[in-house]
């Protein structure tokens, strides 16, 4: 790696990435303290990350067994590529309506995290859709107030807050306005299936495509309030990438409600162009290569109802591009399952983590399922998903022991996933 030729140095780091022993790590870390080549520094960091991933050896301390010359004492400490402990809060189907809800719910949640779970720091907060109820500005003001309250107890930067839209995050009134009534016999254009509505035997509602995209405008403005940039209204740009380098984490957000409106309520899907654009961006950024990759959207793959994602081929793309987990909501009950792309024990796979509803009106609760949320705890090579429940509107959160362990055994309020 000290060769004068660029291609030789690059080839050396690529070869070391295939190393199956962690014994080389001390020498690589020592090399980091001596190199001044910024490109080589990044390659070596990627090499270390690849070795750690292959060897499942994430807790190596870069300062151990390294003798630092006195002349280099001013070199800033190197960030660990993997963290040994990480907490992600997963909320879904919040259905905000009022500022009173924002104040009550944030207080109930912070009290639970602080007092019962003993959490005073979050690495990320994921809201997997249906943040509002009717996608109005007032509802998003309540959601923003909730987040502002929560961040005063648990500080979070904008990049640590992941937001994706659900079917309640598009405004039906704006969707209706985009359909223009026309007498069928007077319409000369091409009628594309799914782009118009049969209003009567003689009248159709033809969609104004530009105006139709505005049904996500209120969500987009809310997104800008929290994330500092508006949510894209063009469908092929409706993906988000939140990279948290300190946690070695990459979270992809997708819009599974991009084809939905007041009339077409069940066309949940993932836009193939948005997914392709996202995966291309991920592949071309070396900083993302060895990250733990999580995908988030709103709708389920399996459901008793028709409002589910039926075209599930995109899961294969996520699997071969290194994604390990996907999170969603919508069904108002916590669930988990596994998508296996390879059948080998160490093959490519994605664990599914579904959160229940955090704030839906009582009339929309699933029988037997109260309000719920998930707390994801990453430690070493294991993810533990803790499920919390709240039955009383003005009550407190508590453990949700619904994960069965076998006949005659006590159910647990958590389940574990080996990473």
Regions found by a protein language model. Give the residues of each.
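Structural detector for internal amphipathic alpha-helices that build alpha-solenoid repeat scaffolds
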Residues: 10-21, 30, 39-54
């Amino acid at each position: 790696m000290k060769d004068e030729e660029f291609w030789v140095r690059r080839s050396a780091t690529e070869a070391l990435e295939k190393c199956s022993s962690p014994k080389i790590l001390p020498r690589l870390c020592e090399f980091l303290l001596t190199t001044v080549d910024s490109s080589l520094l990044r390659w070596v960091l990627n090499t270390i990350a690849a070795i750690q991933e292959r060897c499942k050896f994430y807790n190596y301390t870069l300062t151990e067994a390294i003798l630092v010359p006195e002349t280099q004492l001013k070199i800033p400490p190197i960030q660990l590529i993997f963290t040994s402990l990480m907490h992600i809060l997963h909320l879904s189907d919040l259905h905000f309506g009022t500022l009173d809800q924002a104040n009550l719910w944030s207080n109930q949640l912070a009290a639970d995290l602080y007092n019962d779970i003993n959490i005073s720091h979050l690495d990320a907060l994921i809201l997997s859709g249906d943040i509002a109820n009717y996608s109005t500005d007032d509802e998003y003001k309540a959601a923003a107030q909730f987040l502002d309250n929560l961040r005063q107890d648990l500080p979070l930067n904008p990049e640590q807050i992941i937001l994706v839209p659900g079917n309640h995050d598009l405004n039906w009134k704006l969707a209706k306005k985009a359909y223009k009534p026309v007498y069928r016999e007077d319409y000369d254009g091409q009628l594309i299936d799914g782009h118009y509505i049969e209003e009567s035997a003689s009248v159709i509602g033809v969609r104004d495509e530009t105006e139709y995209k505005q049904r996500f405008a209120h969500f987009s403005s809310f997104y800008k309030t929290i994330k500092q940039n508006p949510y894209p209204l063009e469908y092929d740009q409706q993906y988000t990438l939140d990279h948290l380098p300190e946690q070695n984490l990459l979270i992809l957000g997708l819009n599974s409600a991009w084809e939905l409106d007041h009339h077409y309520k069940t066309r949940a899907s993932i836009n193939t162009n948005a997914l392709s654009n996202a995966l291309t961006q991920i592949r071309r950024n070396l900083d993302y290569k060895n990250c733990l990759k999580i995908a988030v959207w709103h709708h389920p793959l399996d459901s008793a109802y028709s409002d589910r994602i039926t075209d599930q081929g995109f899961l294969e793309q996520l699997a071969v591009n290194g994604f390990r987990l996907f999170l969603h909501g919508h069904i108002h009950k916590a669930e988990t399952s596994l998508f296996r792309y390879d059948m080998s024990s160490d093959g490519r796979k994605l664990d599914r983590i579904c959160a229940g509803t955090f704030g839906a009106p009582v009339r929309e609760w699933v029988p037997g399922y109260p309000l719920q949320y998930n707390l994801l705890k990453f430690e070493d090579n294991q993810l533990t998903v803790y499920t919390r429940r709240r039955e009383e509107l003005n009550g407190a959160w508590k453990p949700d022991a619904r994960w069965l362990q076998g006949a005659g055994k006590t159910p647990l309020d958590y389940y574990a996933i080996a990473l």
